[in-house]
Amino acid sequence: PTVLEQNWNRLDNQHIFFTHRYNVGFSRKVKMTEEEIKAKKFAMASKKENAEENAKEEARKKAKEQGKKFDEKAYDKQQGAKFSGRPDGAKIAGDEPAKDSDAKDIRNDSTRIAVNGKAAADSLLAIQKKNAEDSLFYKSEYVPVTSFIHTVKFDNYRRIYEAYQTPADYYLKEYYDAGRLTGDSIYDQTKHWHMKNTFAIAMLEGFNKWAKAGLKAFASYDLRHYELPTMEGGFEKYNEHALSVGGQLSKQEGKTLHYNAVAEIGLTGVDAGTLAIDGNVDVNIPFLGDTLQVRGDAFFHRETPSFYYRNYHARHLWWENDLDKTIHTRIMGTLSFPKTRTKLRVAVDEIKNYTYFSQSYDITEEGLRTGVIVTPMQESGGINLLTAQLEQNFRLGILNWENQFTYQHSSKESVLPVPAFNAYTNLYIKFKVVKVLNVDLGADMRYFTSYEAPDYSPYMGQYTVQGNGENNVKIGNYPIVNVYANVHIKHTRFFVMMSHINAGQGDKNYFFAPHYPMNERVFRIGVSWNFFN
């Protein structure tokens, strides 16, 4: 059972993000798409029609000013006769060119284009007419070649843990009893801000036929500031600097092959020697009237554990550690086929120097906790994690069935615990009423096999590995079922839901974290309304 009744975590954060990009490139003429050509022809016809209507209206006003009766039929007949003499696109030959001085007559003049026969003349006129028409349906397109980019990001965080009536001996250690609250009350505060500047130069993909991929080079500078409590009730300040450089190679255009690779290396500061390489590639193959996508993802990360694994000060927790860099490698493959609504994903992770929190405590005869302590840990050996996931959806008329099944295996469950199997399924009917009212009626279920799930530390606001040995608690092997109804019309959605409808069934082991039970059966009703013009 949860023994803390009056404790809160408060998180305040503010964020500023600014980026600006300057492009260098050129303009070129490209043919409009079929849709754009149709739209322009419609606009040209509309413009001509409007001009004719305006001219008629002007003639009507002029006749009225002169005290005459406007004869619309005569006007239309006059306009038809005015424009019937020459078809659209007809050309006037112009003045006869002078003869070549050596030519005896026009037929031998080398300065004129020789047109032999009526068919050739018609063909030449047709080509000229088509070229004139085609020139109307080209547009100017700006093609950026090189981009100069600067991005700055600033994040500010403050966390407060506040508690009252903490049970005696609940925590194993006490490092100070000073500050805003003392005795059985706690007021711990940490502060952190982070500013990152990134400068990049990018050669953009596709600006000519030889530029098959985009290329980017960048440099980043990080400044991180932390404030932790001291035993005297003040704050101790820490500053960290990091300079890194990297590059990116990507291809996103085209239908068959796409890829993206990014590498970044830390040069100076706390992240000196870090390395991050990320890449993905996908191949899209026409198959059975649809597209079969085969995608591969991989990364290699050698990174410094975050500041709070290395340094943390609080009234009941205190550490300053020198930790090794974590090395994390992943290889993942994904197979997607929209026609059958199938997605299969398989991933293998290997982690060395994995860093995590472990929480331990003693249990009294009354079932209460004493001697609680949270400790940062680092597993020097390697950990392997295998993940296989299948997403399979079905649809038959108004009936829909969505499924996701995941298998996982960790080589060290005591350090990186995962359920062997978890599933999500959602069965519902979807239909329309009077063509405007969208209705969903259904039920969903979540389930995972039992395992020693991560514990929760309210003092840290973090999940931790259970560190109580034989007293570790297993949760799971219990389905959570919800039933619901959604009604959607235009910008408004109404819903009703009965969550955890199966509460009280089976062994009642409905926990997502040890000692933190879920709510029992709850009925919810609500409305979602989008306000926009």
Residue ranges of predicted features:
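Periplasmic-side early beta-strands and strand-to-turn transitions of outer-membrane beta-barrels
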Residues: 1-2
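Exposed, low-structure sequence patches enriched in small/polar residues
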Residues: 6-50, 54, 69, 101, ...
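Long intrinsically disordered, low-complexity regions that are acidic and Ser/Thr-rich
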Residues: 47-123
